[in-house]
Amino acid sequence: MKRIFLLIATNFAILLVASIVMSILGVNTSTMGGLLVFAAIFGFGGSFISLAISKWMAKKTMGCEVITQPRDSMERWLVETVARQAEKSGIKMPEVAIYQSPEMNAFATGPSKNNALVAVSSGLLYGMTQDEIEGVLAHEVSHVANGDMVTLTLIQGVVNTFVIFAARVVAGIINNFVSSNDEEGEGLGMFAYMAVVFVLDMLFGILASMIVAYFSRIREFKADEGAARLAGKNKMIAALERLRQGPESGAMPAQMSAFGINGKRSIAELMMSHPPLEKRIAALKNS
């Protein structure tokens, strides 16, 4: 969830900047080719900037302490386990870090398979057995090995481009409609036009977030499958069962709930980056 939050936050900022820059430059929505190029530059630009700084940002915002020299047997075991799983997955050893949080959480981030970070919370280390922790680590290493950070960045870039492009096309149509029905033919005016674009950016942005969340849920199932291969199905199921017994998702800040969020039903599930734990456990048992 952490990587999704950082992507979405950065991309909403990019949408706002795009709106301002386009208005200043007077980009004409009737010039579809130019608008599409402009939208793609901003759409993918925001996503790749977010990806490039993801590891640095995670360390700063989460207060991650990277293990360079293990201080005790637990840290040594963490590093050795991640190293073994990374070698088995055919990727370079990710950095391993611990951050202070009472919640049982973990996340993986980084710009590429061979430049990644796997971090676990102190709450996870003290709240799970070693087998369960191994399952969690395998899940995060699988995210890295599957290239999920890059995959979601590309998806986010596509939907960002759609949001920027579609919002301005629709705003242009509204402006032309108002202009045709206005005796003076002035249309919306600059500030009203910017307000319409901003509202459309937000509406299309919500739809885009649902699309990204949908693909993220698919990647979670894939990471669970990968974890089952790396650590064993029973260890992964045990980790998910432990998370299910923990606090409800409402007790966790959304941007920190990087692993195993208990999903809500109906429309709320469409915005979840992770499937409900029950579905993940059932998928593993049936695999």
UniProtKB/Swiss-Prot annotation:
Cellular compartment(s): Cell inner membrane
Cofactor(s) the record lists: Zn(2+)
Family: Belongs to the peptidase M48B family.
Active site per database record: 140
Encoding gene (name): htpX
Binding residue positions for Zn(2+): 139, 143, 220
The protein's name: Protease HtpX
Topology of this chain in the membrane: Multi-pass membrane protein
Pfam families: Peptidase_M48
Main location, first listed in the record: membrane
Cysteine disulfide links: none
Gene Ontology biological process: proteolysis
Upper lineage: Bacteria, Pseudomonadati, Pseudomonadota, Gammaproteobacteria, Alteromonadales
Bilayer-spanning residue ranges: 4-24, 33-53, 154-174, 195-215
Cofactor note: Binds 1 zinc ion per subunit.
One GO CC term on file: plasma membrane
Keywords: Cell inner membrane, Cell membrane, Hydrolase, Membrane, Metal-binding, Metalloprotease, Protease, Transmembrane, Transmembrane helix, Zinc
InterPro entries attached to this UniProt entry: HtpX_protease (IPR050083), Pept_M48_protease_HtpX (IPR022919), Peptidase_M48 (IPR001915)
Keyword Nucleotidyltransferase: no
Organism: Shewanella frigidimarina (strain NCIMB 400)
EC number, as in UniProt: 3.4.24.-
NCBIfam families documented for this protein: PRK05457.1
Gene Ontology MF, one: metalloendopeptidase activity
